[in-house]
Amino acid sequence: MSIKAEEISALIKQQLANYQDELTVDEVGTVTYVGDGIARANGLDNALAGELVEFDDGTYGMAQNLESNDVGIIILGSFKGIREGDTVKRTGRIMEVPVGEELIGRVVNPLGQPIDGLGEVKTNKTRPVERKAPGVMERQSVTEPLQTGLKAIDALVPIGRGQRELVIGDRKTGKTSVAIDTIINQKDQDMICIYVAIGQKDSTVRTSVETLRKFGAMDYTIVVSAGPSSPAPLLYLAPYAGAAMGEEFMFNGKHVLIVYDDLSKQADAYRELSLILRRPPGREAYPGDVFYLHSRLLERAAKLSDELGGGSMTALPFIETKAGDVSAYIPTNVISITDGQIFLDSDRFYSGIRPAIDAGTSVSRVGGNAQVKAMKKVAGTLRTDLASYSELESFAQFGSDLDEATQAKLNRGRRTVEVLKQPLHKPLPVEKQVLILYALTHGFLDPVKVDDILPYQDGLFDYFDANHKDLLDEIANTGKLPETEKLDAAIKEYAATFQASEK
């Protein structure tokens, strides 16, 4: 049998053509400790802070502590499949989450994985969870209002698009209700809402989602949930994941409202991780960089300049206080980062004043510039009315022989408190808020009994919807008050038809 050189060369060429170089170089280390949501590994000498690493079982982790001998890693998910001695390799990537319109209407975990049983989220866009906040020249001042639908907020502590407004109060004072009502009120406002539930019970999150769905608000809302049974790393990452999802819309010229409910639990999760990673504890055992934990998150909320599309992200961070102590470490940190705070008072809540907003300690540092002109006009005296009422109320309990001016202030104060009450999940459009506050500040409610205020208000709205829709539309479209003669005449017309209760 003769060997032909051509056949051999053809065979060698074919072999060379089919050869694939599948050699890859991975930098791998060895797990030396695993437990409590963290792992330690040595051999990853070139790992970067915040870099994703992959364990043998496919679980990902994030490098946090870079020490001379080993790397402290927080594990993103269950750590049950990871053993001491397993290998762990660098990925060269930082953590990213899925983003885009496909997430709207879904409930996802902080990794962007759906947990609502409605199938996978079909998006191929991702964004890093950590991103540098827009700089000074990339922003513009807050000029557009964000209507919450709650009279007490829109009149006394107005919020603008791009603002950070802290909602602070003890547990069970209606903080989550403020968030849900604000989201419901964004319907038809060209706003995308993101509700980040951190450490909230799964049953509570489910109730909130059902409420949003009932009012049609899930059509423009993303819910990011990290329940109390989630590992601490997921509770720590949840707000950053929500911010990354919001930035996708903000940088595309859209308006976003993001609610962090609540950042106290995120700080607790971060404290837990830091102590397990053996970082030195500081005040209240929080690590030294707990201020930076919240500042780098909240600075990502902004009103972007027109060159960048003019989009905005408004943040409503929540903080839970213990026995009304706003001077604790985390509350004072977040108060100093945000553009104002809404303080919810448990005494007011239990006395039936809901939403339980304390007008004396609540403030909005930039929202006044964004307030509708009509609202600014009618709400101008509200804060002073409430302040003088609360001052006089304590004196009034000791005696009834008060002069007429004091009695008038007390009567106006009682009616102001009553007008600012609002039922759950019934946010009001701004024109109706302006209408009832106009009636209050111009003395039309002074002859009405305090118990009749809310029925009077409901009747007034129905009457204007039926007979004076043009006046309401004028407020809604122009943001200014109609001619006072017309408005006064219309309110007097209604007052003549109002039937007071027989009490």
From Swiss-Prot:
It is a peripheral membrane protein. ATP binds at G169, D170, R171, K172, T173, G174, K175, T176. InterPro entries: ATP_synth_asu-like_sf, ATP_synth_asu_C, ATP_synth_asu_C_sf, ATP_synth_F1_a_nt-bd_dom, ATP_synth_F1_asu, ATPase_a/bsu_AS, ATPase_F1/V1/A1_a/bsu_N, ATPase_F1/V1/A1_a/bsu_N_sf. Keywords: ATP synthesis, ATP-binding, Cell membrane, CF(1), Hydrogen ion transport, Ion transport, Membrane, Nucleotide-binding, Translocase, Transport. The keyword Magnesium does not apply. CDD domains: ATP-synt_F1_alpha_C, ATP-synt_F1_alpha_N, F1-ATPase_alpha_CD. Its EC number is 7.1.2.2. Its main location: membrane. One of its GO terms (molecular function) is proton-transporting ATP synthase activity, rotational mechanism. Pfam families: ATP-synt_ab, ATP-synt_ab_C, ATP-synt_ab_N. It catalyses: ATP + H2O + 4 H(+)(in) = ADP + phosphate + 5 H(+)(out). It comes from the Bacteria. Disulfide bonds: none annotated. GO terms for cellular component: plasma membrane; proton-transporting ATP synthase complex. The record marks S362 as: Required for activity. It is found in: Cell membrane. F-type ATPases have 2 components, CF(1) - the catalytic core - and CF(0) - the membrane proton channel. CF(1) has five subunits: alpha(3), beta(3), gamma(1), delta(1), epsilon(1). CF(0) has three main subunits: a(1), b(2) and c(9-12). The alpha and beta chains form an alternating ring which encloses part of the gamma chain. CF(1) is attached to CF(0) by a central stalk formed by the gamma and epsilon chains, while a peripheral stalk is formed by the delta and b chains. HAMAP family: ATP_synth_alpha_bact (MF_01346). Produces ATP from ADP in the presence of a proton gradient across the membrane. The alpha chain is a regulatory subunit. Belongs to the ATPase alpha/beta chains family. This is ATP synthase subunit alpha.
